Amino acid sequence: MSEHHSKRALSLDDLVNHDENDKSKLQKLADNESSVRSDDNRPGAIENIVNGNNSNSDLNSNGVIEEDTDTDDDVGGEFTFDNGITFDYDKQDRFSPEKKRIQARKKDTSKTTPSISNESPSNSKESSVPVDPLSSNISATDRKDSSEEKPDLTGPELVKEPDTNEYKRPSIQSITNAEDTTYNDHKAAGMEKTSNKHSLPNILSDSIDETVTEEHKPKTETEQTITEYQQENKQKDNVNESNSEETHDIKNDNMNQVEKIFQEKTSTLSKKNSVKKDLELLNEISASSKPNKYKNTPIWAQKWKPTVKALQNIDTNDFKIDNSILDIIPDDDLTKSVQDWVYATLYSIDPDLRPFIELEMKFGVLLESKSPDRVNPPVSSQAVYTDMDAHLTPNVDETVFKELSKYIQSLSEITENAGKFNVIEAQTKDAVYRVGTSTQRPRFLRMSSDVKTGRIGAFIEKRHISQLLIYSPKDSYDVKLSINLELPVPENDPPEKYQHQTPVSERTKERVSYIHNDSCTRFDITKVQNHNKGIKSNDVEITHEIELEINTPALIKAFDNIMTDSKEYATLIRTFLNNGTIVRRKLSSLSYEIFEGQKKIQ
């Protein structure tokens, strides 16, 4: 090694700074070389290189530690200085084929390989330096043929001149000044780093800077070893990086496959349930999004709710309802009117004559006084007709008469009513005589005799007291209530006295009477033949009369006890009117059925 250094030519720095002391310059170069050798021989540095610490990012763009070459042989051992103090290295290998291949490789690698930038030590593990094909090629050629001469690649980066379109190196002075600045910066940075992990970049950067300044200095064995380690580590890093990326991709694929395996496959039912949940959520949102005026119904639009539920304490299993809060049934207005009318009429009669009164109800059509038409007052329910000019002729339709007779007969023959009805049939002839003088009120005497035997059954004076007309717009027939007095004729005025006189009217009656003792009512169904003796002819008119007569002794008793117990009187009159209502409605229903039947027959 000493022989090699003794034969060494002067460096470019010596050539440029030739005015300095030659001895001091040589001493400085010797010190630098010794420091590089001592650092290379340390095991720590080699260890860092083997471990793949890629912190040597301060190398040149080609990633190759260039060798120093002698220029004495090329120029005949003499140095020529031009005015620009430049040294043209291109003249040595301008026409060399190896130079062209190297330049072509530089262009390819500059396109495909990103430039190496100085990174902090903390990021040195993550970053990887790409392998330079130029450096690997040069190292391979060195191993194949060590005796072959190599072109000078230690020069600085080529610069293209615009005039000649030729690549030339910059001046020696600019190169040396830039290299000295880089050397000092790297050395200062290396002094600040104390970690053993980052010691290799400092050592390498210092050694590289020294080799750059000593362009003509030949490579030592240690430097060649470092270069080989660097190239191997770069290749390993690239392989490891590609392997790690492949491994990471494989792991990601496996994770995706596992996630896909465990993904729940939604069924049709689950989809429907999710749709229902979404709809419920939308409904809740829409309901909650309504303004307050739509949430709370105003008072005027709310339905009425009773505060107390009706009949809430009634036991339906043992249901028993009272007639009213007073446990009585108040009479309707019509019944009350009849009760008052009867009471007033009876009160007006002499108490000695009250036992001879007769309260009867007859059915017929209420006619106007001046026309044969039925009255038509503006009412829709049963009412008392107060027009005294109207009159009612007791008469019903023959067919209805017969049907009603059958109906009442059937009622009397029902087993449940056995003993409640007394039936009396009679055929009598009534002759009415007018008795009195012109100065007295006329009297009408009625003589009743049996048609078959001719025996006189009764001889009475009949006085008309009062009547009440009741109009029933919903029924076929109206009602007339009348109170009469049937006074017996005194014994000094016997009936034989009037047998030779001409009666005012004669009537032959075929009567069937149904006496219902429980209701104190007598039902007289009578077919009447009226013998009208006129001047021109002797006509006979047949009518069908239905009469209801109240039990007079019961009525007088109830009337006398009205001051102590008014219920008996009110009940008696009400019962009598109820029996009349039943008959009236039955007559109306029979009339309707008969009328509809006649229409069908026609």
From Swiss-Prot:
**Active-site residues from the entry:** K276 (n6-gmp-lysine intermediate)
- Family matches, as CDD domains: CYTH-like_mRNA_RTPase
List localization entries: Nucleus
* Compositionally biased spans, kind Polar residues: 171-181
The entry's function note states: First step of mRNA capping. Converts the 5'-triphosphate end of a nascent mRNA chain into a diphosphate end.
| PANTHER family (UniProt xref) | POLYNUCLEOTIDE 5'-TRIPHOSPHATASE CTL1-RELATED, POLYNUCLEOTIDE 5'-TRIPHOSPHATASE-RELATED
Enzyme Commission (EC) number: 3.6.1.74
Biased amino acid composition, Acidic residues: 65-76
Q: Which family does it belong to?
A: Belongs to the fungal TPase family.
Tell me the lineage of the source organism: Eukaryota, Fungi, Dikarya, Ascomycota, Saccharomycotina
Alphabetic keyword roster: Hydrolase, mRNA capping, mRNA processing, Nucleus
The main location class comes to nucleus
Protein name stated in the entry: mRNA-capping enzyme subunit beta
GO biological process annotation, one example: positive regulation of transcription elongation by RNA polymerase II
Species this chain originates from: Candida glabrata (strain ATCC 2001 / BCRC 20586 / JCM 3761 / NBRC 0622 / NRRL Y-65 / CBS 138) (Yeast)
Q: Where is the composition biased (Basic and acidic residues)?
A: 15-42, 88-110, 141-169, 213-222, 231-249
Provide the reaction this enzyme catalyses: a 5'-end triphospho-ribonucleoside in mRNA + H2O = a 5'-end diphospho-ribonucleoside in mRNA + phosphate + H(+)
Q: Name one Pfam family in it.
A: mRNA_triPase
Q: Which GO terms describe its cellular component?
A: mRNA capping enzyme complex
Q: Which cofactor does it need?
A: Mg(2+)
* InterPro entries registered for this protein in UniProt: Cet1/Ctl1, CYTH-like_dom_sf, mRNA_triPase_Cet1, mRNA_triPase_Cet1_sf
Annotated region described as Disordered, given as residue ranges: 1-249
Q: Which GO terms describe its molecular function?
A: mRNA 5'-triphosphate monophosphatase activity; polynucleotide 5'-phosphatase activity
Subunit notes for this chain? Heterodimer. The mRNA-capping enzyme is composed of two separate chains alpha and beta, respectively a mRNA guanylyltransferase and an mRNA 5'-triphosphate monophosphatase.
